């Protein structure tokens, strides 16, 4: 299996397939010259399909390596049909031989696509040039430490490719130069205004049809292409939509996104709304998530909800909680899980873990003690 960050293909759209000076995606054209939203969205879908093909190739290469170099005979003794066939699980001896890569970032993509369609193509409040510039500068925040390091590395690589001598002094000089780069006051004002406009645009997780449509469709751009692929064990690829906790470190490798998310911050968790963007209550959030096509996500989904203990206190609180769960599954949701703990407790537990041996925090398929 693998983790698939659905924000990365959109980064490649804005960079015409380039990443840190390297052509890692396909060329989908200059984003500032895409005259319609459909043209922009098609570019995202093309980058998505190409990135999926890269992931499948990597997954299958690892499968072959495991079969040839790392067979696990003890595991085979406990997996149905391996002994009968005389093959380990890695060699295709199991009854079921699926590969299940997990995608995440649906909320970021739904919010990003909706914001771009509305602000750039429908209301024409901002140009795509300004949007692209704002993402490059991380909106009003400017370049963070990782962006500085990445840009310096790209410049040094370009110098080496051009035949220039690069040494420690050169690297220091480039780093210091990049660190001094800052957006102008005019740019900061422009990017702040854009970020404020993005904040006002409706977000996934509030039972708003148009935004929820994008979430459902973005999920399809990941799940449907995977269905045509098979692994060396003879099994089919089955999509999942859950990150465990990979949305945090992989978000740390992802630049700013058009939904207003700042560079190198966590990507949305599983099929859950982006943090703090579901402002119409838990029932609305559950309604939005239930509008995804859960039937095609045969490897599972992850929907996290968090409650303050007071929200579920007493019989009335418990009855509302039960009603929420029943409603979600009546609407064909697949999975939901909960944390019922207040922020102060979590912060204190970080400082004094010895006082909280009883504290359980649900993560994804497991709970942390």
Predicted regions and their residues:
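Structured mid-domain segments that build the active-site/substrate or prosthetic-cofactor binding neighborhood
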Residues: 1-159, 167, 274-369
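Aromatic/basic-lined ligand-recognition segments
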Residues: 265-267, 271, 277
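Internal maturation/activation junctions in enzymes
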Residues: 52, 56-69, 83, 87-91, ...
């Amino acid at each position: 299996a693998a983790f698939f960050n659905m924000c990365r293909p959109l980064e490649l759209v804005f960079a015409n397939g380039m990443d840190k000076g390297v052509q890692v995606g396909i060329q989908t054209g200059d984003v500032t010259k895409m005259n319609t939203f459909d043209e922009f969205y098609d570019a995202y879908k093309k980058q998505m399909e190409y990135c999926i093909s890269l992931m499948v190739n990597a997954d299958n290469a690892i499968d072959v390596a495991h079969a040839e170099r790392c067979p696990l005979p003890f595991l085979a003794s406990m997996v149905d049909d391996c002994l009968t066939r005389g093959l380990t699980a890695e060699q295709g001896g199991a009854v079921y031989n699926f590969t299940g890569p997990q995608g995440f970032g649906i909320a970021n993509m739904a919010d990003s696509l909706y914001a771009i369609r509305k602000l750039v193509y429908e209301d024409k409040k901002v140009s795509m040039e300004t949007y692209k510039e704002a993402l490059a500068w991380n909106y009003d925040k400017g370049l963070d430490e990782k962006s500085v390091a990445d840009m310096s590395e790209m410049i040094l690589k370009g110098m080496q490719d051009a035949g220039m001598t690069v040494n420690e002094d050169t690297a220091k000089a480039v780093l210091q130069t990049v660190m001094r780069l800052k957006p102008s006051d005019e740019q900061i004002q422009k990017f702040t205004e854009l970020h404020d406009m993005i904040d006002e645009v409706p977000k996934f997780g509030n039972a708003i049809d148009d935004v929820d449509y994008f979430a459902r469709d973005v999920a399809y751009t990941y799940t449907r292409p995977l269905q045509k692929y098979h692994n060396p064990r003879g099994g089919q690829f089955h999509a999942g939509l859950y990150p465990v906790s990979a949305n945090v470190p992989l978000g740390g490798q992802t630049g700013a996104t058009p939904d207003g998310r700042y560079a190198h911050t966590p990507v949305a968790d599983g099929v859950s709304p982006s943090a703090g963007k579901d402002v119409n209550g838990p029932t609305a959030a559950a309604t939005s998530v239930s509008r995804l096509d859960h039937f095609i996500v045969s490897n599972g989904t992850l929907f996290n909800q968090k409650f303050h203990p007071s929200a579920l206190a007493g019989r009335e609180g418990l009855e509302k909680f039960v009603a929420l769960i029943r409603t979600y599954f009546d609407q064909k949701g697949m999975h939901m899980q909960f944390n019922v703990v207040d922020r102060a407790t979590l912060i204190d537990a970080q400082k004094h873990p010895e006082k909280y041996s009883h504290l359980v925090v649900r993560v994804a398929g497991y709970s942390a003690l």
